[in-house]
């Protein structure tokens, strides 16, 4: 096994002001697998070696990175994943977290979805059919598959059936067990990461704590107080050479600006500074450092951090959904100065990220697809603190027939159920303490609730109820849902429902309502009663008899799946706080719609779909030109040409065009939108034969996708054009 070089992490993790950091983070594109963050510097030779073996060595299929938790395996894998040589060599890429709890079908599904994203939902595909399709796909192309955090050799044995013996595919694998890579491929090339030395640990911590940015944005060093330096060098020894722990300690110390403040941190860590002679002692000291980062949070951030304990391991936590949970519980609130729940939530998460307690994974393709995650060691701290403070109770249900012990329900105000079919057992006894109930289904499973279930009546003071992917018997949501008059959050996303009761009108305090469930449904005209709503997602398919009056929903900030077939365009005029809108046009109301959209001065994200038969041509897409603050625009409307660039807001960042049938090349206009970060043209967006990217165009573009443009024959990129990150 070859040992990696020094891991000096995050050049840019200086202790900027919160405002500076927020501005920077809002502009950076981040994803957990798709990330350009420079977490590793000083290991260029190791990254080059790993990339070289993936691309140039035909004798191996697997490159593995091994080492203990928190040492930087995933971070190193990202650097290799994004290496130019790797990106150019392979036809497709998949990144899958495996972890301790997984099923082979889930791993296979994730690989297929990332390699073939255009093939839609495969959650109901038979496992054997999926295996065959994936095997054949990997036989026919050059693909890189990253399996992150494979724990045991047996785990590989469960996954390996989809991988042909010898083809163009390669695998990058990370594991705490160096034997996993050898087991997967006896000829594998293995790297074993090492811990940082005390000197390297202090150098990393010092970068995080003491570097500042000057007015030009350049990093500059700040003179280090001798007493602080002496204490800091001792404290980093408690981090056991793990970059994760060093980063967390650095994030904590960056909030302390005087010697007495440092002394208090030093005294808290002090008992762990001496006498550490075993691995257990080292782990205890590491967890003490991680715990101390939590203990030093202000109360509002503590609650925000603890809320993350609800989610299963490696769960991609959608930040907007998280903000709505927090708002429903009163943990975050909007302010009189115009600060919204989303603004406040982003402030909280970015502060936790600055302290290196979470990572924020911002999808550079879309403004709204933003997630956060925790390292598994930090998650252990989160779970421990949540249990210690009776913040929530987690039920990991291993089988569909498992039940929840009613006695345990009295311990906490919050319940999180991971998998199984245990929800009906909640109705065995009335519990007036529980305020939130979140259900997380695993992969393609569904919990089944009978129409007569008493579980709603048994939890009368619920404020948060997430029943995503729950299957209701007979498709009927029980009318007893209307008894939960204290609800602020209700999600029925991807639930199996065909009938909604009129008792929903009783839920007048709702802030968040997600009706994005499966199947056709009649929605009673009761949503107008929910005048506190901030977020509303309507069903994709509704019965023709559905007619909704929504003009009283004046506090809405997000409205999804609005259709002119079921509600009046004029209702939008009253929703002056809207930031995000997805809208289906089903009639000839384009003029009214255009003027209505022009009144939405806060609108930042617009998704517009034409469902008229026959489709109407919107010449130049004038229908959206009055939206003066747009940052993200998705259009699926017929328009012969794209509007001129000067008609759009200068900070438009993301454009997604499909089924537009544009006859004129849109690139000469798009490339002059100076702040564009992603452009997607697909499914007949352009029906011409030739596209040209000019020299100097797209100065900030990170992502360009051209797909299913059947008439396109020639794509010209003029010499001097800047590098596209992904194509």
UniProtKB/Swiss-Prot annotation:
Pfam families documented for this protein: LRR_14 (PF23598), NB-ARC (PF00931), WH_DRP (PF23559)
Protein origin, superkingdom: Eukaryota
GO cellular component: plasma membrane
Residue span(s) of domain NB-ARC: 44-336
GO annotation terms (biological process): defense response to fungus; response to molecule of fungal origin
Record keyword Transcription present: no
InterPro entries: Apaf_helical, Disease_R_plants, LRR_dom_sf, LRR_R13L4/SHOC2-like, NB-ARC, P-loop_NTPase, WH-like_DNA-bd_sf
Stimuli inducing this protein: Repressed by silencing mediated by polycomb group (PcG) protein complex containing EMF1 and EMF2.
MF GO annotations: ADP binding
Keyword terms: Leucine-rich repeat, Plant defense, Repeat
Ubl conjugation as UniProt keyword: no
Start-end of each LRR repeat: 459-484, 485-507, 509-530, 575-600, 601-626
Family, as annotated: Belongs to the disease resistance NB-LRR family. RPP8/HRT subfamily.
Name of this chain's protein: Putative inactive disease susceptibility protein LOV1
Organism: Arabidopsis thaliana
Gene for this chain: LOV1
